[in-house]
Structure formats: structure tokens, C-alpha cells
């Protein structure tokens, strides 16, 4: 028996002898340049797109692209924007997809630092300057955008029970105890965007003795609910949104993080009726842009370029508000008037001003501070 | 090499030994690679990480919650399941096969379907909500309980525990019912003549406790194990809490990436090691109980026993049928919800009947994988799992039986435990092994189209072995001795001495394999992040998780869940046909 155990031990530990040598990630050199990596798989004529569950990519939309260009498309879906970055990092040595769609500006710089994207070959025109503000380099192209901001339930924030906050500090007052829900910046893209906005907000307020994490600590002490994702926060806990009519709804929070146009979307599907509205305090909102980028190590590069061009075409991108519930990145983009979509959508007066580079540099530290503050 | 060494291998063909090594390797390799990978990324050994487990955010809360809910779930399952199994095994029942299939149904229902079924049951408009039991928003009695005790979310806890009991009741039936049905009536008669057999308590103490104890403990151990490692049910029914399993699922995606979120890799390393050790202890306990249990089985003919006790009393009929109705309620709710849509406008809420959810599910209007593709994926993985797991499971079971028959009990015990390892790792750990382990060092596997079948095979193999071992043990060696005197080839000899006797258990194992693979969620949930292999259970989760600004999202998810449920039921019906065939032919 001992002999058998010894053989088994040898059998299973011998192959691991070389495994403890850490695999070094590929990163940009000191000048920020990245080598173009070899293709991670053999070309088979199928464009593989790494994305999350983006509603705009319907069968019909993909079929039209295939009919127009002749390229077949296969989707590799992950949970969210963060999942795309993780997938790209995990498969960096042998990328299996050609095009990443859905990285937002809180993740983009990290992807660039790790040389996960390579330059496209498109001549881009007609994109709005606002969409190009966070990044206008060759490695990623914006395809939709929206402003992340606080949403509240007007039926509860009625001036009597709760009053509309004029400062984020108002939310730490006793009246708001247990009435707020936030998606975690560790696992949620809107949560990450909003936390970044709070950093800028508290750096620019009148009080120099406190920072964003003091506020997060005070929020946690005031019974704020933290969820892993946007869906749990908005659908299960937030009382002002569609969740009220969905199985499993709790409705214990009057305020949450979503988009400034979420009330517009509520009205669009609710026959011009919603009890949700957005709170656009200066610098508490975050201009989120989502990008398409050709993967460094991708195989079907021509097809990937063609898909980006298709994604930015008038026929697809102009319809983003209806098909993807986000704003188009084309010049002169507007929200639809149907069912009060535009009427219930607010525009922030001043978004948080925080660069992609700073986000990439400091995000891990912020997340660590956020965890400490909210524990 | 000693003579003893040779003798230990003599009875087991080399190919079976290779199967044993392959199965153990399949279980050990990914998780070992994952642990070593996490070690390399963090620079911290699993042992050091284990010591720091209490410092990992959420780990201790998750541990306490897992322990508490698993203990309560196990207790309740035993309290409800034991009388159910006793009554079901003791008396004659009409449509016993149908009832047995229905009692077994929850165990093979994909957890994600069960979760959405329970959600529909406890949400406004659901049966429980309508009778004033608000487990979701925790108003009324449940709210009062929360306010009085200071217990956070008792409603979510009750919903989760109820779902676990619903899920695991079939384990009690599976393990305890055959013992009750086959217990030798002479024992009862003899005990009735003794002073200690004159009272109910005395009969429980001197007959039923020693006879049913081991089987009950085995079922309880597995119930505890499945509740402790619960994933999909926790995700949906107790959103404010985490088991260690769901916590690992939440953070596992970022683990094992060099230079990126190292603290997450450390947390995964610590929690995974801790959970694995815990489960290992559970596994050893379960193995010990199961070995004791296997000595009690096959004592008397079941049909004669049932005839002796006659039909059940009205009280027992009500109890068993009542449980059956309760077991079917969440599944019926899933079907109903696929035809209902809630709409809202300034005038208020309305609820209408609709086929739109089914239309969208069929047409794949959403950006997710089309229904037929997801169904094809699910069935492909299930059949690949079956084709690999069944012969492998047979070879391993055959080896274990041979070793036991030749007196190598200890070696058989060790190998048996090693083969059960994937069960101890739980689905998310297996998935993590795939993502952070094999795929990190062998990225070529990314292009392997049946990749999700690999963790499925790992997870179903222990069940196949568990079914095959007793079936092979029951074969009388006299058949082999007699067949060896007849002129027949190797294949013919194998068929007449073994194969023919294993048709039914093999069919049952096949059905279990298919159903288990169809509904598997945890491992696929992680593996699916690194490939385009959405199965039907993942599709249900994807659609159900989508923002529901559009009111037809939920009916669509329910329609998909219904399809998954029906397909799984079809597979299960094959299983019950095999049992029926066995009853008719009594092989």
C-alpha cells in the first residue's frame, strides 16, 4: 500500500515541478509600446467576439453583418466589462477571440497597459468629441456611452419622508439609514464608475479633511446595502425601478447607482410612466464610454475591422438607445422621444473629471480602501 | 517487487488500473494545478493561505452561513425525509414507480430551474405570498420575526433551507427506503416477543435505529455536503448572503492572473483550501458510513415485505401525497410563469397571459445563444460525459470490487476515496481548477469544443462508480465459474458473466449522467467565462439575470427553464423505464 501511495504521489507531483515559476504577464515597455503577438489560434474564417450580454447583438444584426461581409461570427460571452478584461488577461498567451467589445473606460487603460489590444485600421469619422474624450488612440474605438449617476424613487423622496440630496453627505444622515444600495466596485462596472466619481467629488468639495472613503465608511455605517452587481441593486433592492414588478423584488432602498438615462428607459417600456429620476450633483456622475478593440493575438483581423466599421455605421449605432439602452457615439446623437425616453433622461451639468491613466494607476488602491471602509 | 505486490494487481486487468489512475488523475490534476498556480501568483503556500482564511473579506461570514444553513437543512431533511422513506418503503403504494420518479425529480432538476421556481412561489402573486407568508420582502409574520429577533433576512434563510430540503429529500428516499423495504420481518417478530420490543420507543431503539441509522447518516452527510456547497440556490434565494461556494464563484474569475488583483488570488487560495479540507473530512465520514450501510442491504424480498404490511393508512397516504404536491409546486410555478407577463403604467400593475416569452425563447430574440444551439450544446456535453464516464466508471467499480473480493479492503477503501475526490471539491472548485489550472498551462484546450464536458465527467464519475460497485458486488461468482466451462470468446464470456447483469444499473447510471450534466451549473458557470460554450442552464441564468426593463425577459427565462426541465424529465423517464424493466425481468 505504501508503495502504491508513493507511486501515486510521484505521478501527480512530478509534472508540477516546473509550475511554481511565475508566468510573467506581457506589459507595455517604458515608452508605452507593445509588441504585436502571434495569433493565438489557427485561422478558420470565423470572427470570434469576446463580449458580455450586449442586447444590441441580436441574431438579426449579426446575420446582416454576415450577409454584407461574408464573415461568420461567433460570440464568446462573459458576465460584464470586468469579465472581458479578466478573460483577456487569462488568455493573454493564447488569445482565442479576435475582437473585444464592451470594455469601458474604467478598464480600458489596464487592458492597454497589459498590451491586450492592437491598433485598428479604420479611418474614423463622425464620432462625437464627448465619446472620444476619455480615449482617442488607435487601440480602441468607442461604440456606446452613458452617464453613471444616482437614481432615486420619487415616491419615497417626496420632500416629506426623504428630501432630495443636495450633497452626497446628506445620504449619511439618519433619515437615509438603510435606504441606499450600491453595486460593489470590486465586481460591478457601474459600481466602479460611481466609486471613481466619488473620488473626484470629494477631492473637489469644500471640505479638505475628508475624502471619498470617509464618505463610503459613513455610508456603510448608515446601513447602505452593497451588492455584487448592478442587477441585484437595481432589480432586487431599488424601489423606484422595474424591479417592483419582477419576482424576487425587495424594494428596501430608495436610491441606487444606475445611469442618468435609466428613468428614460423605464418610461420607454412603461408607456411614458416612471417614478424613478436621476440625481445629477456636480462631479458625482461619471461619463462611461464602452469600447471595441482588436485583440492583440487575435486571428481574423480583417473581419474584426469590418465589424467595428459595421458597429459604428448609422444603421446600427444610431439605434443604440432602443437596442442597447445606451447613447450612440455618433455626432449629434439624441435620445428618442418615444414614450418620454428623452423627457425622463437627465444630462449631468459636470461629470467627474478623472483620467483613464489615473484610474488604471490607482484603482486597485481605491478598491482596497473601499473594502476597508465598507467592511 | 514483492509477490504481494504482484498479487494485488493480478486480479485487476491493466486497462482497469489505467482507468483508476486516469480517474484519480482527472480529479486531482486540475485542482492541484489551480492551487499551484495560485501559489505561484501570490507567492504564498496553500498552508499559509489557510492560516489567513479568517482575514479574507467575507470568508468567515460565508463559513458561518454555510455551516448554519447546511446544519438546519440537514436536520429538516432528516425530520421530513425519514418518516417519508419509512412509509414509502414499508407499505404497498399505487403507482409506486411514478411516485418514486416524482420524489426523485427535484434531485435531478437543474438548480437554476429550482431557484427560479421558488422565486416565483415566494414573490408577490406566488402561492406562499398570497397566503401571507412573505419570505422575499419579509413583511407580515416574517417581518415580525425579523424585528423581534434582530435576525437579518430570516425569510431568505427559510426560503433557502426549504429549497435545500426540497432538493435533498430524494437522498433520504434513495438511501433509506430500500433498507426499510428489505428489512427481514423475522427481526421485528422476534423483537415483539421480547420486553424491549413492547413499546414504540423500544422498537426504535433496538431495531430501527441500528438498521436505519447508517443509511440515514449517509443521506444526512450527502445532504449536508450539497447544502454546504450550494451555489445557484444561494445566488437567487439569499442575495444578501454567501456560502463559501458562492463566494468562490463570485471572485473566482479574477484568480490566478499574474500581476492583477493578487489579493483576490490569495482570497481564493485561502477559501478554496479551507473548503477542500472541510469537504475532505465530510468525504471520509460519508465513505465510512456508506461502507457500514452497504452491509445492511439485501436482507429480504421487497415485494413480500410490502404485501405483508398491506396498503398505507389514510394518514400516511395524506402525508406522502402532500409531500409530492409540495415537491411539484415550484416546478409547476416555473411553467405557469412562462405564460404570465406583468406590465405597469400610470394606471397600476396588470398581469396578463402571453405566449410572447415562448416566442422569444424559441426565436432567440435576445443577444444570448439561440435556444437550439444551447440545447445542442447541453445534449452534446451530456452525451460526451456519458460516453466517457460510463466505461470509466465501470472499470473503476470493477477494480474496486475485485480488490475487495480478494481481501484488499484497505487499498480498495483508499482508491474509493480518491475516486470520490471531485465530489469533495464541489462544482465551483472543479471549474476553478479548469480555469486557473489546466487552461493556464495548456491554453490549446481553449479550442477544444467539448471543454465543459470535462468538469461534467469529473462530477458524474463518483455517482457512476457509486451505482456500479453494489451492482457488480451482487453478481454471483458461480456464473463466471459455469461460463468458463462453456466454449465462448472473451466478449461472450464478459457479457454472460457480467454485462447482462449490468444493463439496468448502467442505464440508470447513464440517465443520472445525462440529467446531472444537463443541469450542472457551478463548474459550467466558471468555464463558460473562457469559451463560447453556453449550455441551456447557463442560458436560463443569462436571460433571467438580464435587466428586466422589458417585461418579457422573465417569461422568456421561464420558458427556457421549462424546456430545460422537460428535457431533463425525458431523460429521467428513461431511468424509470430501466427500473421498470428490471422489475419485470428481475435480473
Name each model feature, range by range.
Chain A
Residues 105-116, 133-165, 185, 191-201, ...:
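Periplasmic solute-binding protein
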Residues 26-110, 235:
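Early extracytoplasmic/lumenal segment of secretory-pathway proteins
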